[in-house]
Amino acid sequence: MYQIRIEFTFDSGHRLLDYNGKCAYPHGHTYRAEVFIESQSLNELGLVYDFTDLKDRIKTWVDENWDHAFLLNSRDSELIEGLSGAKLVRLH
């Protein structure tokens, strides 16, 4: 088994629904994420996947969707209504 791993960080805000404490209010974190790609064999170049291409594609997607975004729970109707018109990312 062959494997490559990409690790990166991004900053986002969120809040916890149905929580009795200060985390019920909007706040932010620096998140650390890891992506693993596995293969039983290597390609014709001797790679699982082009590491640079994969890293760039994942980082671009994260930057466009999660970095410096406010991540909303789909049940958070109060905040969703308050932010209507803004670009929203909903989590389930």
Which residues does each PLM region occupy?
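Charge-rich, low-complexity N-terminal segments
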Residues: 1-92
